[in-house]
Amino acid sequence: MSRSVFSTLRPVIGQKTTLAPFALSLRHASSSSSPFSTPTEPTSFHTQPSHSTPTGPLPLTWPSYLSLRRQRRLWSTLTSVPTTFLGLFLGGGYFASLEADPSQLIFGVEPMFVYGGATLGCMALGYLIGPSVGATLFSLTHPSIARGNPAPLEVMDREFYHRIRKNRADPRFQSVQNIVPDFYGEKIVSLSTYRRWLRDQAVYKRKAMHGVPGEDL
């Protein structure tokens, strides 16, 4: 009697064991399709470092930064005038005090011409160091934005030039008759000029791409 009962119950036990994996698969499918579930394993094992700019809030707004950038450029331009004349006066005064003997040539050239060229060189040197002096004076008069690690103005400069490099036209397509307009964005002083700069870059890209063979692109 017990043997016959065991033989009748064996198919039922076998059926339960075969349904168990199917139930587990249904449970796994329902849990994975749930919108609130979180995967236990990462989808990718090889993650590459991101080279994009930081997405955090910028220390300055763009209108205020462009206004400060315009002021700094103005300071650099204005200080070039006194430094140029200072180099001219210092160089001219020094070389004028030297005794020039026409019979003694300097590299085969009369001393008067050499001293005159050196005076012009001092004037050019004063013109070149003018923007650096102006930028230094601007930083001293605006310590809240020019100091720090990193300084707010430095962060904005980095972000600004990143956008310039990203949106400007490819210089490989330029020619003597068709030069990239404002390649470094030096004329950008406001949001309106920045939008105009973007339009100019787009127009240049269309002109540069027009008529270029496909194999050269």
UniProtKB/Swiss-Prot annotation:
Residue stretch of the organelle transit peptide: 1-28
Localization in the cell: Mitochondrion inner membrane
Transit peptide found in the keyword field: yes
Quaternary data: Component of the PAM complex, at least composed of mtHsp70 (SSC1), MGE1, TIM44, PAM16, PAM17 and PAM18.
Region (Disordered) location: 33-56
Biological process annotations from GO: protein import into mitochondrial matrix
Pfam families registered for this protein in UniProt: Pam17
Family, per entry: Belongs to the PAM17 family.
Polar residues: compositionally biased ranges: 46-55
Principal location: mitochondrion
Keywords: Membrane, Mitochondrion, Mitochondrion inner membrane, Protein transport, Transit peptide, Translocation, Transmembrane, Transmembrane helix, Transport
Membrane disposition: Multi-pass membrane protein
Sequence ranges of Low complexity compositional bias: 33-45
Provenance organism: Cryptococcus neoformans var. neoformans serotype D (strain B-3501A)
Cystine residue pairs: none
Residues that span the membrane, as ranges: 78-98, 126-146
Function noted in UniProt: Component of the PAM complex, a complex required for the translocation of transit peptide-containing proteins from the inner membrane into the mitochondrial matrix in an ATP-dependent manner.
CC terms in the record's Gene Ontology section: PAM complex, Tim23 associated import motor
This protein's name: Presequence translocated-associated motor subunit PAM17, mitochondrial
